[in-house]
Amino acid sequence: MLSENVVKLLNDQMNLEFYSSNLYLQMSAWCDQQGFEGTAKFLSVHAAEEMQHMRKLFTYLNETGSLAVISAIEAPAHEYKSLKEVIETTYEHEKLITSKINELVGKTFEEKDYSAFNFLQWYVEEQHEEEKLFSSILDKLNFLGEDGKGLFLIDKDLGNLSTKA
């Protein structure tokens, strides 16, 4: 049985994953409007992955006899100055998710809820991969620059990444 504190944190995380899905889907719409079709596809695939993360938490809460509570989700920003701003925003958002997962893992360990602690290890590993991915995309963008050729190459690369996911 999960404690009230852990249930609240799991529900908060579930709703944050839901927001993440909406954020990446909205970013994909902006990218599509700007002609960054590869990035739009990549972010759309990533939005679906975030929804899977949300569903995993939803299922876990219900399987443990707790109630998964979906809250009102704030609308994400829909305007960006550049592709670089989109990528920087995704990277910063993933760092926020990591900090929230770490807080949740710490709380489960503190409360000696080893089942929840074990369940969350998947998210710990996933966040390591997410931060690494978005950091490397940002590094490439900084290296290639924001001129036409650099943006073309990044967009093409992200489009290729979306087919591997």
Swiss-Prot record:
Residues that coordinate or bind Fe cation 1:
17, 50, 53
Q: Which Gene3D superfamilies match?
A: 1.20.1260.10
Look up the domain of life of the source. Bacteria
Residues engaged in binding Fe cation 2: 50, 94, 127
- Where is the protein localized? Cytoplasm
- A molecular function (GO) term: ferric iron binding
Domain Ferritin-like diiron residues, every copy: 1-145
Question: Which keywords does the record carry?
Answer: Cytoplasm, Iron, Iron storage, Metal-binding, Oxidoreductase
Chief location bin: cytoplasm
Cited PANTHER family: BACTERIAL NON-HEME FERRITIN (PTHR11431:SF127), FERRITIN (PTHR11431)
Protein known as: Probable bacterial non-heme ferritin-like protein
Organism, scientific name: Haemophilus influenzae (strain ATCC 51907 / DSM 11121 / KW20 / Rd)
